[in-house]
């Protein structure tokens, strides 16, 4: 049965260096083709006008699989699970995981960009902040991001409206565990400060990545994803395996 998979960006990068985001999978005994598209959470809907064959693929598919089933992600039950897993369960707090200087730096950044006072949320895991600080700074920088324009949500909602099956390749529980429990609180705190202390570089990198995606330049996206600083801020091989290759 045909399927239309909204894959995460780096899954798409792994396929080829050609300038295209939509891939047709056929042959090898398949009765009908399937399609794979690489999505990017910061890409506007206008990218769809540039993807050759997209409308045809959406029309022909009989089911749609995304990284996650977006309707479930928005459910009260899932939101409650996320609220539980993003909080520190032991005696640690943000102020004990960070030095006084780092806590002050992180708190200043979060107040200015996330409208969040860390003193009022001492049990938040650093990974929760880490997953938001770069995007928040990027959105503030470009000033024209529409959070309602999410490609994954669009593809799935279109499929639902047309009576097609929709599901996810991963569960919310799997992703929550990966993002918030995949590495120690100390490592989370270290990576948080790496990001905040280099926020301009991180925003510029994300800007370059988004521009490359809009050009469907997979070569450039791969190069950006492989850039390293040569210090403790770089992902370890184990972290890369968990986040990209072993999923």
Spans of features found by a protein language model:
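Boundary of Sec targeting at the N-terminus
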Residues: 19-20
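Catalytic-pocket segment enriched in acidic/His residues
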Residues: 247
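Intrinsically disordered, low-complexity, compositionally biased regions/tails
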Residues: 10-11, 31
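Structured, acidic catalytic/metal-binding patches in enzyme active sites
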Residues: 27-34, 40-243
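N-terminal signal peptide c-region/cleavage motif recognized by signal peptidases
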Residues: 14-16
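His/Glu-rich zincin catalytic helix
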Residues: 24
């Amino acid at each position: 049965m045909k399927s239309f998979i909204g894959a995460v960006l780096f899954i798409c990068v792994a396929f080829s260096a050609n300038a295209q985001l939509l891939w047709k999978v056929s042959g090898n005994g398949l009765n009908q083709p399937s399609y794979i598209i690489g999505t990017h959470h910061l890409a506007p809907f206008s990218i769809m006008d540039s993807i050759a064959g997209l409308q045809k693929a959406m029309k022909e598919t009989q089911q749609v699989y995304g990284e996650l089933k977006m309707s479930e992600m928005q459910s009260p039950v899932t939101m409650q699970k996320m609220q539980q897993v993003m909080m520190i369960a032991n005696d640690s707090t943000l102020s004990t995981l960070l030095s006084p200087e780092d806590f002050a730096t992180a708190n200043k950044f979060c107040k200015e960009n996330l409208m969040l006072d860390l003193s009022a949320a001492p049990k938040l895991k650093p990974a929760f902040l880490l997953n938001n600080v770069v995007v928040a700074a990027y959105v503030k920088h470009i000033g024209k991001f529409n959070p309602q324009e999410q490609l994954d949500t669009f593809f799935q909602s279109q499929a639902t409206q047309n009576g097609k099956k929709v599901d996810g390749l991963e569960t919310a529980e799997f992703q929550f565990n990966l993002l918030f429990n995949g590495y120690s609180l100390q490592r989370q705190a270290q990576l948080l400060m790496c990001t905040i202390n280099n926020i301009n570089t991180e925003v510029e990198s994300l800007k370059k990545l988004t521009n490359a995606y809009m050009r469907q330049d997979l070569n450039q996206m791969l190069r950006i994803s492989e850039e390293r600083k040569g210090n403790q801020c770089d992902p370890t091989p184990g972290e890369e395996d968990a986040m990209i290759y072993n999923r």
